[in-house]
Amino acid sequence: MKIIVSGAGAWGCALALSAARHPAGHAVTLWARDASQAERMRAERQNARYLPGLPFPPALTLASGDLAALWPGADLVIVATPMAALRGMLLALHGCTAPVAWLCKGFEAATGAESGGLLAHEVQALVAPRLLAGAFSGPSFAQEVALGQPTALVAASPHDRVRAALVGALHSPSLRVYANEDIVGVEVGGAVKNVLAIATGLCDGLALGLNARAALITRGLAEMTRLGVALGARPETFMGLSGLGDLVLTATGDLSRNRRVGLLLAQGRSLARTLESLGHVAEGVYSARTVARRAALLGVEMPITRAVVALLDGRLSPADAVALLMGRGPASELMH
């Protein structure tokens, strides 16, 4: 297969490495927006900034410049950009005939008081409706995928061709790829788990204990499921890799940037200093308000998400955010 990976950050490089090492012998091109970055990686045969010490295999080539020039004959284009850059990338890809899959997890920021923000497939439907597109998601850290450590991910798309392309390109002895038609559920899981991981990091940073962590993860999963079902997702999707799986990993893993946001805020660090220290995008910070707004427009109850938004906006201290959640009145566990 001929595979194009657009975006040379940690995730783009990790999947490019995985595809280039595939036993089927794929030809993989990693495209970088910055020509100097592409030249540096070409010379060093590694991404020294994000994945130092992991050499590029011979099947991986570097490119920059005109992305459209790479499309002819491509079997799959993987978009490895943050959510904020997805719209522009999809506009650039509007004439592409190969299957396209994005890696970003989140909601595009709302543009007005009446807008709740958009999931990736909703953005694509607006700006590039003819694309055969989908999402590639699930519980994974880029570093572990790049190292070839065992991982399971989900290829989500209503299009058989997109799911088949992702499975063919990336399913290997170290990376299991499961197919799912429910792109709404997969994207909601990927977006909301980042917000919930901030809450869990806050819990751990305040040393509230393992009971509290388990409660947050479980009730967070309920919030995620309620929002997803309201948006048309299948509830069983949230018991899978992109729901429960990604939530547990992001909420508990030490490599999680969103969890680290909560940890640092619990220590009294400002949000600005926290984001500056990360060096990478923490999508939960940018998605939290949009998730809360979309939920409000749909009448979906998401108290943990609302508390995270109040914390990020500076309206609640870490201790007050916890007190707000614990001070809520009794409710049925199976509330709909």
UniProtKB/Swiss-Prot annotation:
NCBIfam families: PRK00094.1-2 (NF000940), PRK00094.1-4 (NF000942). It catalyses: sn-glycerol 3-phosphate + NAD(+) = dihydroxyacetone phosphate + NADH + H(+); sn-glycerol 3-phosphate + NADP(+) = dihydroxyacetone phosphate + NADPH + H(+). Belongs to the NAD-dependent glycerol-3-phosphate dehydrogenase family. GO terms for biological process: carbohydrate metabolic process; glycerol-3-phosphate biosynthetic process; glycerol-3-phosphate catabolic process; glycerophospholipid metabolic process; phospholipid biosynthetic process. Pathway: Membrane lipid metabolism; glycerophospholipid metabolism. NADPH binds at W11, R33, K105, A142, R257, V281, E283. The keyword Protease does not apply. GO terms for cellular component: cytosol. Keywords: Cytoplasm, Lipid biosynthesis, Lipid metabolism, NAD, NADP, Nucleotide-binding, Oxidoreductase, Phospholipid biosynthesis, Phospholipid metabolism. InterPro entries: 6-PGluconate_DH-like_C_sf (IPR008927), 6PGD_dom2 (IPR013328), G3P_DH_NAD-dep (IPR006168), G3P_DH_NAD-dep_C (IPR006109), G3P_DH_NAD-dep_N (IPR011128), NAD(P)-bd_dom_sf (IPR036291). It is found in: Cytoplasm. Transmembrane segments: none annotated. One of its GO terms (molecular function) is NAD binding. Sn-glycerol 3-phosphate binds at K105, G138, S140, K193, D246, S256, R257, N258. This is Glycerol-3-phosphate dehydrogenase [NAD(P)+]. Signal peptide: none annotated. Its EC number is 1.1.1.94. Catalyzes the reduction of the glycolytic intermediate dihydroxyacetone phosphate (DHAP) to sn-glycerol 3-phosphate (G3P), the key precursor for phospholipid synthesis. The active site is at K193.
